[in-house]
Design a protein with these regions (language model features):
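Conserved acidic donor-binding segment of nucleotide-sugar-dependent glycosyltransferases
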Residues: 310-311, 315-322, 331-336
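Conserved catalytic-core segment of nucleotide-activated headgroup transferases in glycan assembly
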Residues: 180-181, 186-240
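Donor nucleotide-sugar binding/catalytic pocket of nucleotide-sugar-dependent glycosyltransferases
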Residues: 132-146, 151-173, 184, 192-196
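Short alpha-helical donor nucleotide-sugar binding micro-motif in glycosyltransferases
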Residues: 265-270
């Protein structure tokens, strides 16, 4: 604990020095010209980085040079700053220029998630007066924020996006090739799980329980009683799930896709995708599955209730309800014509989260109103 505090304090000193140095350059007229909006992303090649990169790419197509992305908030000395992570916002908020308009996402988190989450939420709520806008991706989270006393007019409900032109339903040839690549046998039911559900960025043998890896394994064990199950995993830190599948005697493959095109091909092998989390902001795999024509059974978390109509465009169950997850999965897998109607409905539902739509909404609902208030 003492070492963590020392590291944390050292980081804060570094943040302050960097931020005040950049502000001094700006006052001297030596800071480079920037677009009016800066999105702060994470260095890790994962969801927050992708979120910011795709919004910026699409927004600049709509309104050229309106936004840029950075991993260094100290470089943002004027204009609008939008943080892709509420944790980044918390780390940097005391060192940012008061000339800036402040925006952050709040994608997930609730008091029931434990002491650390509760402390973070309390600190976040203390910071709300400093914020001009808060972006929530899901109705569940927006309603939660309002219940905690956040003014509704500060919250923009904008989904996390999906590359619907990249994540497309597989052709028969693409499906056969993907399944052959991972050694799937004839008649096996391939269930996908593409996420990070271990603690840290190593092997991930300690489960990140908020992601429900224990629920996933319990659901697979139940489905194995009735079906020849094969599990396809992607994402880092999957050691806990891999060990669990080996104990269950379930055949599986784990492939960490090096890029988004490779990730899209993994969905071609799937018959079903399971989201078994206890808390989510999206997840991105929910939208990617629906866009790819892969049926989803999800717990009632994140964007799932906004996108899925139970029995029409997927399956929706309460968190931790293993029996319900297995029942919905069996029901969907037994639908006629390969669940074609459900797949079609799912893809239509997810189009509201195409990145071009998401970027347009950030421009119209968040950035432009703040630019007008600033006289920009």
């Amino acid at each position: 604990m003492i070492r963590r505090r020392l590291v944390s304090n050292a980081k804060k000193v570094g943040y302050a020095a960097s931020a005040y140095g950049q502000r001094a350059l700006a006052r001297a007229g030596l800071a480079p010209a920037r677009p009016p909006v800066g999105i702060v992303i994470e260095r890790a090649d994962w969801a927050v980085r992708w979120w910011g990169a795709f919004i910026a790419e699409e927004a600049n197509k709509i309104s050229p040079d309106i936004v840029w992305i950075t991993t260094d908030p100290s470089k943002l000395t004027s204009g609008i700053i939008e943080f892709g992570s509420q944790y980044q916002w918390q780390a940097w908020r005391k060192f940012l220029s008061p000339r800036c308009r402040m925006v952050t996402t709040f994608f997930h988190g609730k008091y029931e998630d434990g002491a650390e989450a509760s402390e973070h939420i309390d600190q976040f709520l203390e910071s709300v007066p400093q914020l001009d806008r808060i972006v929530a991706s899901a109705s569940i989270v927006r309603d939660r924020l309002i219940g905690w006393g956040v003014p509704a007019q500060k919250i923009a409900l904008i989904p996390i996006g999906c590359e619907t032109n990249r994540f497309l339903p597989a052709t028969d040839a693409e499906r056969q090739a993907a399944r052959a690549r991972f050694g799937v046998c004839e008649g096996e039911i391939v269930i996908g799980s593409f996420q990070k559900d271990g603690v840290g960025w190593g092997e991930g043998t300690e489960p990140k329980l908020i992601k429900g890896p224990d629920v996933f394994l319990a659901a697979i064990a139940e489905l194995k009683k009735h079906l020849p199950v094969f599990v396809l995993l992607s994402g880092p830190a999957r050691g806990y799930v891999r060990a669990g599948l080996e104990r269950l005697g379930v055949r599986y493959a784990h492939h960490y896709a090096p890029d988004r095109d490779e990730l899209a091909k993994l969905y071609h092998a799937l018959d079903l995708y399971l989201v078994t989390s206890r808390e989510e902001g999206g997840p991105m795999a929910l939208m990617e599955s629906m866009s790819s024509g892969v049926p989803v059974v999800s717990t009632y978390v994140g964007m799932a209730p906004d996108l899925i109509t139970d029995g029409v465009s997927g399956g929706l169950v309460q968190p931790d309800d293993v029996a319900a997850i297995a029942e919905r999965a069996m029901r969907i897998l037994s639908l006629p014509d390969g669940a074609s109607a459900l797949k079609k409905a799912a893809r239509e539902s997810v189009m509201v989260a195409d990145w071009s739509v998401v970027a347009r909404r950030h421009i119209d609902e968040v950035w432009k109103p703040l630019m007008q208030r600033s006289g920009a």
